[in-house]
Amino acid sequence: MERILGVNLSGWFIPEPWVTPSLYAATGASNAAELQEAMGTAAYNERMRRHYETFMSEDDFRRMAQIGLNAVRLPVPWYTFGSQESDASYISVVDYIDRAIEWAAKYDIRVLLDLATVPGGQGDSNDSPATPEAVAEWHSSTNGRHVALDVLERLADRYGEAESLLGIELLDTPQMSVHKSLFTMTDGIPAHYLRNFYRDAYELVRSYMPEDKIVVFSSSGHPNEWKHFMRGAKYKNVYMDLHLYHYRDEYALDITSPRGLTTAISRNKRELKEAISTGFPVLVGEWSGAAIFANSSVTPEGRNAYERVFIANQLASFAPAAGWFFQTWKTEKRIAAWDARAALGTLERGMIE
């Protein structure tokens, strides 16, 4: 398969305050559920309908192809096909996914559909500079598993044989519970629950998708936990998704120093090596140019220069991977470290490839 060089299309079907702050203006909301509650169902759905119509266009796909990209990772919500719940109502986004699939085919771009939300939440939402601490209660909800499997099956049924479909990611970055010590576990979804879900989800989507389409699961930040997973002959074209960020928590690094830059790139290489050692082809499903700037005297121009060097070095470190998806294609305020039009658009095509 051709190496995957892509971008995420975050904020299109799942409104993100850091991508499109105008959607949240004067509401006090920080996620889709809060936004709907603040606005009321009818006003919320009308605002989202306008957003779905205008946020992405065919010209975006043309520009992606123009700078050398050949894939998009498209986060979709559990209510992709619409939902009428007692406390909330969501309109379907499938007509807009149809457009993405058609535009992608026109410009020789492949689409990875990524189930990015589930009822109750899957936890580790690590895709933005300002995401609140997420909650993982999906495995405890009464119908969460059924809803997730249902939307995956319907996505595979509708798009499984589409020429431009790269594949389906079964669940975006679930927070997995692992051993913190001999007798204690971290918060999150039990590993056995995720493994069983992934096996069942694989069976469902593969029944609609030919074997050349990939099925992706998240490492959940612990690649070694998956060493002996999905090893039977019936599992075809299964990829692992690894996310690599350097802007917060213990991974926050100052890239204005040579040591900080070297440490970040060494971490990329180390974690990629660990993931690849499991035997799965590995995709860096999310990464960005975001990092820490400890030197307050760095000018905006200087910051852009540091980020450009950081991005170029990260691209080189991803060489062993089967591909990558920058986070994200576009932001309303054109945030340089997170907006591929700024971050990748000025790079020479050879650096991306």
Where are these regions (language model features)?
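Active-site mouth of glycoside hydrolases
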Residues: 2-6, 14-212, 219
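Short, loop-centered acidic/histidine patches that primarily coordinate divalent metals
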Residues: 77, 81, 285-288, 329-330
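Glycan-binding loop/region signatures in secreted carbohydrate-active enzymes
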Residues: 4, 9-54, 264-272, 277-284, ...
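Aromatic-rich peripheral "rim/lid" segments of glycoside hydrolase catalytic domains that contact
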Residues: 299-353
